[in-house]
């Protein structure tokens, strides 16, 4: 390898897909379901015990920090039996070597039972639940394979998580259908007492492939936008409306990932989310068969780094190719971004969304740029105030009182 790989500048992080793209739902906008087409020649998309042990041993061994974070993702993670995750705990304990092990798992919530929740509680797992707000919004796109709505089952799952005291948060997709109702969306999460929410804008383009996939790779530039994609205007209005309620009522009580990362960038700290960081490439993904890709949103043949049976995680994640992938986030910014007053706040967002053109016709502008710019312009005075509070070692939540007094 051409560069020194230790000591590492940051912890090595690889998200794991124990069932690949296998899922009991068939959400219209899912970017991952079709990845099963990459593995048509493999009949069973499940991670073997041998591979699981190899991954856990190597993943822990490659860390230089005392805490190690494992992230289990899908597909639908709970389509592996509970015995699989009990084995995960056994192997983590076997190879921990004095380190603290943390686990988080993403699920659609429909398969949760008392038994699953007891396991998560006992082992302190953080559970992320995919839920797109109230029933009308959620069921528009999140249906099962028979075309039936999934909301009721998801809510039953959330009820079980709460009953067992499991720590959980929500991942909500903002699409063309629900983006016009930000407060309905937000009030729903407050009503179900969900204090940590990640709102993710869905942006996909259509490009049929010979193997059955139909979503465009980031390398393809002029493909048709999928109907379910949120528009830049919708995204900007959604964020501004949401922020106006949050900043007046909920700072320090409800945590919205994008608002947290925006404030972090405002004060010059790490945003804690790759989309808003200067560079990316630190979050790889490993498929059920050991294939490792640059990123969860870049699981395309052209972004495959190798396989854990042939190369180590360190070799792949610190390879020159992956370093270039991460650096390209910054290096490929068009002039309009480089000259933008809010570059520090978004850093061009996710490279997968950079298929628009600038006012000068230069390629590489983020499709959602107009929405983000509207948001940053709107929140600037509030972010400035919260930054001042943080730098004075006071609580950002003081902003709510300042607004009441008419200081802002």
Question: Where are the regions a protein language model picked out?
Answer:
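Flexible mid-to-C-terminal extensions adjoining Fe-S/redox cofactors in radical SAM and related proteins
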Residues: 299-408
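Conserved alpha-helical substructure of the radical SAM core
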Residues: 1-118, 122-124
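Conserved AdoMet/S-adenosylmethionine-binding subsite of the radical SAM
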Residues: 57, 61, 79-198, 205-207
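Short Gly/Pro-enriched turn/cap motifs at secondary-structure boundaries
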Residues: 272-276, 283, 327-331
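Short loop/turn microsegments at loop-to-beta-strand junctions
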Residues: 14, 280-282
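Radical SAM enzyme [4Fe-4S]-AdoMet core and its adjacent flexible, acidic
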Residues: 144-152, 159, 163-275, 279, ...
């Amino acid at each position: 390898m051409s560069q020194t790989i230790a000591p590492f500048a940051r912890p090595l992080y690889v998200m794991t897909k124990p069932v690949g793209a296998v899922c009991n739902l068939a959400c219209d906008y899912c970017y991952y379901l079709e990845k099963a087409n990459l593995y048509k020649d493999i009949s069973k998309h499940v991670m073997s015990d041998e591979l699981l042990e190899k991954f856990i041993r190597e993943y822990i061994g490659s860390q230089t920090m005392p805490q190690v974070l494992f992230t289990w993702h899908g597909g639908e993670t709970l389509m592996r039996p509970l015995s699989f995750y009990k084995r995960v705990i056994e192997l983590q304990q076997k190879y921990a070597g004095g380190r603290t092990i943390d686990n988080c798992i993403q699920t659609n919530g429909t398969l949760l039972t008392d038994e699953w929740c007891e396991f998560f509680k006992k082992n302190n797992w953080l559970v992320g639940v995919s839920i797109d707000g109230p029933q009308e919004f959620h069921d528009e796109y999140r249906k099962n394979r028979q075309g039936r709505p999934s909301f009721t089952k998801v809510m039953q799952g959330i009820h079980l998580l709460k009953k067992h005291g499991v720590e959980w948060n929500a991942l909500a997709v903002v699409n063309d259908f629900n983006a016009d109702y930000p407060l309905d969306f937000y009030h729903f999460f407050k009503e179900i007492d969900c204090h940590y929410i990640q709102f993710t804008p869905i942006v996909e383009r259509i490009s049929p492939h010979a193997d059955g996939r139909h979503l465009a790779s980031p390398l393809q530039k002029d493909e048709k936008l999928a109907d379910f994609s949120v528009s830049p205007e919708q995204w900007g209005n959604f964020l501004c409306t949401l922020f106006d309620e949050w900043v007046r009522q909920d700072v320090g009580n409800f945590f919205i990932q994008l608002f947290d990362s925006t404030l972090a960038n405002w004060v010059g700290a790490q945003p804690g989310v790759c989309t808003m960081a200067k560079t990316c490439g630190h979050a790889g993904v490993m498929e059920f068969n050991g294939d490792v890709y640059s990123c969860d949103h870049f699981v395309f043949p052209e972004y495959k780094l190798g396989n854990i049976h042939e190369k180590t995680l360190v070799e792949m994640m610190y390879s020159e190719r992956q370093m270039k992938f991460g650096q390209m986030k910054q290096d490929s910014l068009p002039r309009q971004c480089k000259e933008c007053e809010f570059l520090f706040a978004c850093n061009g967002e996710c490279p997968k969304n950079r298929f628009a053109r600038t006012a000068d016709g230069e390629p590489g502008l983020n499709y959602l740029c107009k929405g983000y710019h509207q948001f940053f312009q709107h929140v600037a005075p509030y972010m400035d105030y919260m930054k001042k509070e943080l730098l004075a070692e006071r609580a950002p939540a003081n902003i709510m009182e300042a607004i009441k007094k008419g200081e802002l």
